[in-house]
């Protein structure tokens, strides 16, 4: 066969010349592109490539087995543990030369073992034979000595006994020969047993050394191929080893003892204490008693306190705080008791308390703000930069029946007061009025004492307060309260002295009384404008409007008109056909129909907007009051209204506020429970008046609830079981029946299903339209629960003139009735020198010798006092009776 060049061979093999030259170089043959290749060189290259591309030197097998192990537990119960054993083994392909070398070593090892075994057997045989010969020689010597003794003794005996002695000697000789044979057999068995044990020991030692040499030679697999336990449980490890032996069929037994010992650095290895305990258990013997390890320490090293960074939200439970500090809940409770606060492990505590406890225990506290989402939503709003003048928001305040609503009616030329029950404004009305000089927004607040929170809310949302004072009535309690609200809000006050047309009007007295509370007229050097008006005659109305606009110019009121709107809820209620309705006063921006609003705990999209006249509007600018529809629920009056971008985020913020309010409420309730614990223990039985309250608007619900709760006394407490806005439903009636409560409807009525429940349960249902009547009737109901007052009333006096002795009653006082009537079986007091010396009961009352029930003034009688004999002449017997007086709540 002719030689071929590198280029030709590369073309045949369909590879590049450079790659082929490199392959020849790897095979130890240096060639260039133009060199020729012989057949031997080609065969060398092929052998090299076959060896290089042969199968893998290593083969890795992974196996996973699952089993269940029943572990005995405390109390005789056992629990099942699922065990999963994962194995990974690597098998290495041996080199043929290495295999031959190992085979030769094994053959030499086997020959050495066989030689050692034969030598041991021969040595044991020699020792056994020598020992048997020595024992036989000694036995023969002993027998010869005994025979000599017996022969000497036989010579002294009578000759007729020689035949018998001969027979006995023969039998004894046979017996001795048998004993010698038995002794020789036992010696041979003992020698054979020792020989076998020695051979077995030598073979086991040789096999162990061979196994160790084999594993040392095959030590190429790394720690990944080592067999390790996947659990630290002793029972699970035993089950794993049993499973390994079943699967492997006894393969690799030579290293079981070695593998049972965990390697250094193995994270699954047992601890030192566990290993000592296992060794002690093995050494325990038949009794199975464990002995304490002598190497185990008798003390534990004290652990150093770890100071952690504890992140605390606005509220947290005691258990969660303990987990954050990695301590037991009992330690946190002890720390709180040291600080003077009692708590349970599930109690919610506020951020300040949790901070004190954590710092007291040596940890660093990180306070977390939980309203980050809320702040992000509020900051992502479009607000215009240019501020424009806006209309003033004016709140009319004053005492009840001083003419606030009538004054506003005249300004608006409507009859709003006629629609209010009893002529009293029940909730805030918001109206905007167009005048010749500009627009003014009026807020009408109730003047009754119950509506304090509503009045305060009106003052916070206003720019100017018009204080209406009746000229004939002067300053009244609600007038003073309105002044305080105005001062707290920091808004200017314009005083409207109303009812100036009445003959008994005295405006100067009004000025003097208001000056005592810091409201000084301008003519006296003060800052407040005083305007004399008459809501009925219409006098002074223009002057009042001019004064309001003048004050607004001084304030330079401005607001951003463009951008997302924000404002406040003036009033809210639940309409049966429209759902939740909120009266909103826009402060800045423009509120459009379709905007997404966030309002306290509620959110929603503005589906419709109406002004105070009930007309549909599409937008509302600053200082404009509107009713909006589309909220998820009835918001609380006074809540902030904000237009946001995303309805989903608005919902998240609303839900977060609800959860936060609930947590704070629970924390407050827990705190009040702990603080009032001892007070509740001592106050005894307290009667409760349960009430389910429904009203037309949210403001009325708040006002009535506050007024009723203030009626509570130490003996009778008012408890509002449920309250809400809207008509009385079947759910309200069921709640009232379950809690034995009174159903109160303020400007609302019960529906048909609720009336059926009320009739079936015979519930007490009451309708009201004026708050005075509601409070008076609840007072009457509470008065009926008061226990009556016991009063002692003196009905007669009798003077002791003489004392007689009676065998039946003892000392009998002969008396003259000086005042009133003395009645039998009534309680009495015995007075001596006007000092009570005894209080008891009149047992016997006689006139002459007849028993009588009563003796009137000016008559003589005999009186026997029960269980009392120390009656003297000159004493006065006072007869009284106990009467019950029904108490009332003031």
From Swiss-Prot:
Keywords: Acetylation, Cytoplasm, GTP-binding, Initiation factor, Nucleotide-binding, Protein biosynthesis. The keyword Protein biosynthesis applies. Residues 67-81 have a biased composition (Polar residues). PROSITE patterns: G_TR_2 (PS51722), IF2 (PS01176). Residues 534-536 are annotated as: G5. Residues 498-501 are annotated as: G4. Pfam families: EF-G_D2, GTP_EFTU, GTP_EFTU_D2, IF-2, IF2_assoc, IF2_N. It comes from the Bacteria. The keyword Acetylation applies. Residues 45-304 are annotated as: Disordered. Residues 398-405 are annotated as: G1. GTP binds at residues 398-405, 444-448, 498-501. It is found in: Cytoplasm. Residues 423-427 are annotated as: G2. GO terms for molecular function: GTP binding; GTPase activity; guanosine tetraphosphate binding; translation initiation factor activity. InterPro entries: DNA-bd_dom_put_sf, EF-G-like_DII, EFTu-like_2, IF2_assoc_dom_bac, IF2_II, IF2_N, P-loop_NTPase, Small_GTP-bd. Its main location: cytoplasm. Belongs to the TRAFAC class translation factor GTPase superfamily. Classic translation factor GTPase family. IF-2 subfamily. One of the essential components for the initiation of protein synthesis. Protects formylmethionyl-tRNA from spontaneous hydrolysis and promotes its binding to the 30S ribosomal subunits. Also involved in the hydrolysis of GTP during the formation of the 70S ribosomal complex. This is Translation initiation factor IF-2.
